[in-house]
Amino acid sequence: MRGCGLPMKMEHQVACGISLWKGFDFNLHFQGAGKSTFSIEGAVAYPFSQGYWGNIMTDVDGNYWSLGKNENPNAKYPRLSFGGNANNYRTSTYWMRDGSYLRLKNLEVGYTLPTKWINRIHLNKIRVYFMGTNLLTFSKFDLWDPEMGSTTGEKYPLSRTFTLGLTLNL
């Protein structure tokens, strides 16, 4: 990603772990970045860049400036063009986007069974838990995940995972 216009990217992380009532525990981890900008490129900024039969992103389709019968003066993107007429796609601050985000990176909720229950089966500890990764992202940028490190959006997003687990201590 190319930065422009802001003096420094601020990265932040917040983590919290709490042992709650009667064997329940809760851990969460937020991660994010502020004061981050980047210039979008690729198929969003240059539709048909792969040739006459090239693709355009869904967000561009029907949301570009046009004249005539289907005029769209309040479009999000400049007019579509192909070939040598690429003046619409010159580098400018128009293509700059806010890359700031806040993500709930990890969430874990667990329950440890009381020792009086597990002593009967000769174990020290039994804990059941649920863990989720990349559950929520808050960002003004909605075309793709701002943490991907891509100016084109042509990468797989981060996986959202869910885990159910059991911890046994002998």
Where are these predicted regions, by residue range?
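Short sequence motifs at beta-strands and strand-loop junctions characteristic
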Residues: 4-9, 94-103, 156-158
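Hydrophobic, lipid-facing positions within transmembrane beta-strands of outer-membrane proteins
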Residues: 10-16, 104-107, 160-164
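Membrane-embedded beta-strand positions of outer-membrane beta-barrel proteins
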Residues: 16, 28, 128-130, 166
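Transmembrane beta-barrel domains of outer membrane proteins
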Residues: 17-19, 110-114, 167-169
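Repeated loop/turn-to-beta-strand initiation elements of outer-membrane beta-barrel proteins
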Residues: 23-26, 116-117
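Transmembrane beta-strands of outer-membrane beta-barrel pores
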Residues: 30-36, 106, 113, 132-139, ...
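Extracytoplasmic gating/loop element in the C-terminal half of outer-membrane beta-barrel translocons
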Residues: 33-127
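C-terminal beta-signal and terminal closure region of outer-membrane beta-barrel proteins
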Residues: 62, 66-72, 87-92, 135-170
